[in-house]
Amino acid sequence: MKVVLQRVSEASVDVVNELGTLDPTFEPQQIGPGFMILVGVTDEDGDKQIAWLAHKILNLRVFEDAQGKMNRSIQDIGGEILSISQFTLFADVHKGNRPSFIKAGKPEHADLMWIKFNEALRSGGVPVKEGRFGAHMRVGLVNDGPVTIVIDTEHDMPDGTR
């Protein structure tokens, strides 16, 4: 799994239908201070990656304390998460000018892993709002910092836990 995490003061998502207008079947989602995360899944990802990544995000100390140091977690500040599934995080651009997405997980597997991942985040007591898997979305955010961190279970998980 790969996550691009951005610390935000606010973020929102809408779903756009095939006519290019807002999809009336999707209720727009908004959060206040917290994280907007883009989530990519491969076919090799499973429960171990979900548990490790959710724990890492819930405990990541990137919010400032009274002394202005990044020393507080999203749980500490009572923040929220906006989770957006994004297969394009696994784009391969080595050959030519058109990206290949062969490394991205198959939709059925990726959707299930994304749902389980969001539940793992919620189990840490943090409200999680979501986009719609596989949909064309408009995502808005106000970066705070900015603080942007890429976490990739393939490279960041300690050996022996993958």
Curated annotation (Swiss-Prot):
It holds the Pfam family Tyr_Deacylase. A Gly-cisPro motif from one monomer fits into the active site of the other monomer to allow specific chiral rejection of L-amino acids. One of its GO terms (biological process) is D-amino acid catabolic process. Its EC number is 3.1.1.96. Keywords: Cytoplasm, Hydrolase, RNA-binding, tRNA-binding. NCBIfam families: D-aminoacyl-tRNA deacylase. It comes from Bifidobacterium longum subsp. infantis (strain ATCC 15697 / DSM 20088 / JCM 1222 / NCTC 11817 / S12). Homodimer. A motif (Gly-cisPro motif, important for rejection of L-amino acids) lies at residues 145-146. It is an enzyme of class 3 (hydrolase). GO terms for molecular function: D-tyrosyl-tRNA(Tyr) deacylase activity; Gly-tRNA(Ala) deacylase activity; Ser(Gly)-tRNA(Ala) hydrolase activity; tRNA binding. An aminoacyl-tRNA editing enzyme that deacylates mischarged D-aminoacyl-tRNAs. Also deacylates mischarged glycyl-tRNA(Ala), protecting cells against glycine mischarging by AlaRS. Acts via tRNA-based rather than protein-based catalysis; rejects L-amino acids rather than detecting D-amino acids in the active site. By recycling D-aminoacyl-tRNA to D-amino acids and free tRNA molecules, this enzyme counteracts the toxicity associated with the formation of D-aminoacyl-tRNA entities in vivo and helps enforce protein L-homochirality. Belongs to the DTD family. One of its GO terms (cellular component) is cytoplasm. Transmembrane segments: none annotated. This is D-aminoacyl-tRNA deacylase. Signal peptide: none annotated. It catalyses: glycyl-tRNA(Ala) + H2O = tRNA(Ala) + glycine + H(+); a D-aminoacyl-tRNA + H2O = a tRNA + a D-alpha-amino acid + H(+). It is found in: Cytoplasm.
